[in-house]
């Protein structure tokens, strides 16, 4: 089931201004990403805001940053 931007925002613990939610959509901070249908966004009812401030860690990222020595 899909919800409009206003409906999705109203279901959040702390509803934000509509412009803030639109900015989150443009910055890909909502997962799964909303679908643009004409003039409005449609959100999946299970969509959540993703926090981009958390550090990204992973073995591949470490290998890219440190070279082959990080693999072993």
UniProtKB/Swiss-Prot annotation:
Query: In Gene Ontology terms, what is a biological process of this protein?
Result: DNA recombination
SUPFAM superfamilies referenced in this protein's UniProt entry, alphabetically: Putative DNA-binding domain (SSF46955)
| GO molecular function terms attached to this record | DNA binding
Presence of the UniProt keyword DNA-binding in the record: yes
- What are the entry keywords? DNA recombination, DNA-binding, Viral genome excision
Q: Does the keyword DNA-binding apply?
A: yes
What biological function has been recorded for the protein in this entry?
Excisionase and integrase are necessary for the excision of prophage from the host genome by site-specific recombination at the att site.
Indicate what this protein is called per its UniProt record.
Answer: Excisionase
* Organism field: Escherichia phage HK022
């Amino acid at each position: 089931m899909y919800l409009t931007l206003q409906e999705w925002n109203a279901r959040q613990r702390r509803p934000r201004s509509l412009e803030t939610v639109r900015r989150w959509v443009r910055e890909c901070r909502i997962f799964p990403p909303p679908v643009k249908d004409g003039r409005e966004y449609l959100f999946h009812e299970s969509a959540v805001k993703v926090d981009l401030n958390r550090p990204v860690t992973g073995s591949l990222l470490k290998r890219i940053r440190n070279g082959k020595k990080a693999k072993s």
